[in-house]
């Protein structure tokens, strides 16, 4: 995969100076020639930043490495990612650093990271049309997170709903990473100078905190980062098989779209439907039946199916069976692609490595600019 023209690489070293990690001057660069090297570095950084400005607006989204995604993940987020990759310069990151706040087994994290990468590609993300990489493969973001910590009041972080809820419900599993989670989120977005973030309206408060952190940094050190703007997506809230709560692996109410067909059938046949429809002859209420609602996404004839429920021409079992077969057929190509990718982890790792390398110049140029503004060079 050739790097995109808007992400032109720049030299990691100056014309005459010795370079250390992340392109920073080594201690030996203290002579007059070292000062010249520093000036060259500054010019190179400005050039890198200019060359990394995208021809199309740049969009960023982070994705938790939870393993194979379920139906709610696809309908609620992944389908939007696929659509956006042609409208924007799209950067998608599997956020394994974030996952460390709750996933503590190394092998589980490695496996779930690769599973999510394979699933995203199988479901339509094209590494030639977007950048897909793993968060920890660009460690510059952790440095920016620390620097953002120095401009972020603790009170902002303590008021976040996720932290407050976890502190009340699981006080023994609250760590510093959970508290500073929003700071790393802000760093994730702006280290690549992304100006847009795809979110549902319920996620607006999370993005607003990222914007506050960016404003705090820009106010103290000068205009450095764009304030990320939301791109509101039409993402449905997909209820789980219990019919009452949002589909979630932690609850165990999911439909695993990349699982084997028999597994999908079993999960769909277990779905709760209209609780007021007791007998086969009772009329149904498709507007409250989760099975009927899901038919909207897997066939243009859903209104006909709904009418069958209202008039009791169709039973709940029939409606479930039809939904199961449609979901199995819809995801069959993705299921095969997923299996092929998981059978060749070296190929999958190569795709992720190429994504991380593609955005390396942007991350390095951003950190050069940030260090200079903060007096660290």
Where do the protein language model's features map onto the residues?
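Intrinsic low-complexity, disordered N-terminal segments enriched in polar/charged/small residues
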Residues: 4-6
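Short, positively charged and aromatic/hydrophobic N-terminal segments
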Residues: 9, 15, 29-38
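N-terminal Rossmann-like or analogous alpha/beta NTP/dinucleotide-binding catalytic cores
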Residues: 36, 40-187, 335, 339
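Structured ligand/cofactor/substrate-binding pocket environments in proteins
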Residues: 69-78, 82, 91, 95-96, ...
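Conserved nucleotide- and phosphate/pyrophosphate-binding catalytic cores
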Residues: 71, 205, 211-377
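Divalent metal-coordination and catalytic microenvironments
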Residues: 120, 148, 202, 294, ...
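Short helix-capping/linker segments at secondary-structure and domain boundaries
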Residues: 152-158, 191-198, 298-306, 335
